[in-house]
Amino acid sequence: MSKTPLTVAGANKLKAELQKLKSEDRPRVIAAIAEAREHGDLKENAEYHAAREQQGFIEGRIKEIEAKLSNAQIIDVTTLNAGGKVVFGATVDLSDEETGKEVTYQIVGDDEADIKEGKISVNSPIARALIGKEEGDVVTVKAPGGDKDYEIVAVKYI
């Protein structure tokens, strides 16, 4: 199985969530289950069933994060030297050929993608069109809404 690329920031975010789940959320739910058990009959105890359900979600998320981290190839973007080419982790300034509007995207792993923060998945149509290109190149992005042309204004590794 191939490793999944992940930036250092993305890995740190997952590690922080994992730490919170293990040190805060898990003990809180265990205490809630113990308290609900003291209320007697478990068959008709809604608090108990809700706490057990929440425990299942927390344990599932812990396993999911641990699996992601164990299968991750953590890439420090600041140490990249790709010679100006667009690669995973690069921050790319683009100019829309039609409107002249400029946008900035960082190419990140699937789990880190957040368009509001300007982070796009390495598997997105825009990122796939950009990978391997350089400053000054014009790329055509094939998107569901039609083709769009962008000029690569700058490539940074920050």
Curated annotation (Swiss-Prot):
**Its Gene Ontology molecular function terms?**
DNA binding; RNA polymerase binding
User: What's a Pfam family this protein contains?
Assistant: GreA_GreB_N
List, alphabetically, the InterPro entries matched.
GreA/GreB_C_sf (IPR036953), TF_GreA/GreB_CS (IPR018151), Tscrpt_elong_fac_GreA (IPR006359), Tscrpt_elong_fac_GreA/B (IPR028624), Tscrpt_elong_fac_GreA/B_C (IPR001437), Tscrpt_elong_fac_GreA/B_fam (IPR023459), Tscrpt_elong_fac_GreA/B_N (IPR022691), Tscrpt_elong_fac_GreA/B_N_sf (IPR036805)
What does the record list as coiled-coil region(s)?
A: 53-73
Q: Which domain of life is it from?
A: Bacteria
Task: Tell me the protein family, please.
Answer: Belongs to the GreA/GreB family.
UniProt-recorded name of the protein: Transcription elongation factor GreA
